[in-house]
C-alpha cells in the first residue's frame, strides 16, 4: 500500500501584506498612506459634498435597533445566557448606541479598533448589579490617528496587537508625552472593525480612497475659481 502523506493543518501561505517597521505600505500614494492618510481623510470628511454622504451612512448604522435573539429550538438552554448578554449591553458607563456611533468611524478611516474594558459587577464599581460576574465597563474607541504601528505573530500571518501613542490630557489641551511613550494593546483586548479584510490588512480600506482624485480635482478647481473671482473683484492694476 502507498502511504498517505501527512497533511499540514496550519497555514503555509502568507497574507502578502507589505509592511515596514510595523507600518503598512501597500498604498503608493503618500497622501493615502499612513500616517498622512489620517489628515487626508479628516479634510475630505469636512467637504460639503462628502460629509452628508458619510453622515447618512453612519446615522443609518447607528439607528439600527440591536437586540439579543435566541436561535429557534434553544430558548430554554440559552435563556440565561441571553439575559446576561442583554444586561452586559446595558450596564456600561456609556450607552450601547454611543459605542455603535464611535464604531461607525470605520466608514471614514477604513478601520475602528475598540478596546474591551472589563470590570467585576459590583455596585461599588459602578455596575447596576452586585453578583460579582465579569461584565463590560466600556467599549472605548482607540482613536485611529493615535495608532503608531502594528505587530504580527506566526510569521506575519496573524495580528498580535497594536501600539498606541500615549496622548495624555493636560488641562484644556491634549498633548503627546514628551517621551513619545507607546502602549501595546494585544489583539485579544480589542475588537477590530474593518471595511475590507483584503490581505488581512488591519487598516482595512477607507471608502474615501476611491473618491480621493475627484475630491482633489474639485478642491483645486475651487481654489482656482476663488483666485479668479478675487482678481476680478480687485480689477486690473494700472501703472502710472
Where are these regions (language model features)?
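Low-complexity, highly charged intrinsically disordered N-terminal segments
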Residues: 66-68
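Beta-strand-enriched accessory nucleic-acid recognition/scaffold domains that flank the catalytic cores
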Residues: 48-60, 78
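Structured, contiguous alpha/beta core segments that scaffold functional sites
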Residues: 3-48, 59, 83-240
Amino acid at each position: 500500500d502507498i502511504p498517505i502523506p501527512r497533511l499540514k493543518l496550519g497555514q503555509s501561505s502568507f497574507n502578502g501584506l507589505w509592511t515596514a517597521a510595523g507600518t503598512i505600505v501597500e498604498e503608493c500614494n503618500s497622501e493615502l498612506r499612513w500616517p498622512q492618510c489620517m489628515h487626508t481623510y479628516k479634510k475630505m470628511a469636512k467637504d460639503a459634498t462628502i460629509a452628508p454622504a458619510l453622515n447618512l451612512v453612519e446615522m443609518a448604522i447607528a439607528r439600527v435597533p440591536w437586540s439579543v435573539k435566541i436561535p429557534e429550538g434553544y430558548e430554554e438552554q440559552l435563556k440565561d445566557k441571553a439575559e446576561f448578554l442583554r444586561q452586559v449591553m446595558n450596564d456600561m458607563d456609556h450607552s450601547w448606541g454611543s459605542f455603535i456611533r464611535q464604531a461607525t468611524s470605520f466608514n471614514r478611516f477604513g478601520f475602528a479598533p475598540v478596546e474591551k474594558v472589563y470590570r467585576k459587577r459590583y455596585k461599588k464599581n459602578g455596575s447596576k448589579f452586585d453578583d460579582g460576574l465579569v461584565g463590560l465597563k466600556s467599549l472605548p474607541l482607540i482613536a485611529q490617528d493615535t495608532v503608531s504601528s502594528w505587530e504580527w505573530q506566526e510569521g506575519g500571518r496573524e495580528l498580535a496587537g497594536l501600539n498606541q501613542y500615549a496622548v495624555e490630557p493636560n488641562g484644556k489641551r491634549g498633548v503627546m508625552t514628551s517621551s513619545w511613550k507607546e502602549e501595546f494593546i494585544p489583539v485579544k483586548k480589542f475588537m477590530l472593525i474593518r471595511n475590507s479584510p483584503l490581505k488581512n490588512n488591519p487598516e482595512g480600506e477607507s471608502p474615501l480612497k476611491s473618491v480621493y482624485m475627484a475630491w482633489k480635482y474639485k478642491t483645486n478647481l475651487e481654489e482656482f475659481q476663488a483666485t479668479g473671482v478675487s482678481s476680478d473683484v480687485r480689477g486690473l492694476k494700472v501703472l502710472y
